[in-house]
């Protein structure tokens, strides 16, 4: 097949395909998210507030909106690609938390803070605008990307540690002795 190159803004990094078929690109060298039409290769840029913003990764919610990590400013953000409205929240560990990887599961946002040791796994509920955090086992190191499994667990890795971790999400009320946030066998983190 043919390969077509298109010029973009600085350092395209994370990329996701939306349910609408459009391609969303995070720019780690600019304060922007791009929306690419795969038929025409036309790019529409959404400007993210603050020139020092750097977007590493993004994911698409069930409503087609974009969730992203603003690594340089220690924030997570939400972009409505229909209206262009952008909103950001401070990550729990502050401006040096360096959010990196992100995934949306059932409209709950999961991401890591790579500026912490050990990394923190963070859960953000957009409806209540509340955060929860868990320390990730130090053997897993800096998480650079996450994947969602068919059973809605998170797979996390850091290439220099030679390990893959699984985060199993527990639904419902905690048992009398809550084990969420504890590390189980084979680098499994239980998160509620």
Set out the residue ranges of the language-model regions:
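Residue-level detector of Asp-centered blade-edge/turn motifs that repeat once per structural unit
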Residues: 17-20, 60-63, 104-106, 148-151
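Blade-level signature of beta-propeller repeat domains, shared across WD40, Kelch, NHL, RCC1
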Residues: 137-192
């Amino acid at each position: 097949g043919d390969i077509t190159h298109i010029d973009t803004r600085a350092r395209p990094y994370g990329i996701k395909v939306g349910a609408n078929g459009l391609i969303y690109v995070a720019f780690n060298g600019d304060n922007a998210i791009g929306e690419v039409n795969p038929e025409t290769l036309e790019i529409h840029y959404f400007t993210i507030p603050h020139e020092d913003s750097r977007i590493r990764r993004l994911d698409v919610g069930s409503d087609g909106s974009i969730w992203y990590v603003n690594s340089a400013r220690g924030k997570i953000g939400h972009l409505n690609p229909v209206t262009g409205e952008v909103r950001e929240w401070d990550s729990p560990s502050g401006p040096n938390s360096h959010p990196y990887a992100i995934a949306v599961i059932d409209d709950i946002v999961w991401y890591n803070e790579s500026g912490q040791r050990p990394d923190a796994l963070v859960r953000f509920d957009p409806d209540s605008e509340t955060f929860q955090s868990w320390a990730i086992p130090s053997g897993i190191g800096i998480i650079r990307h996450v994947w969602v499994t068919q059973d809605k667990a998170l797979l996390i890795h850091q290439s220099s540690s030679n390990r893959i971790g699984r985060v199993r999400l527990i639904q419902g009320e905690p048992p009398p002795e809550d084990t969420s946030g504890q590390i189980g066998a084979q680098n499994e983190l239980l998160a509620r």
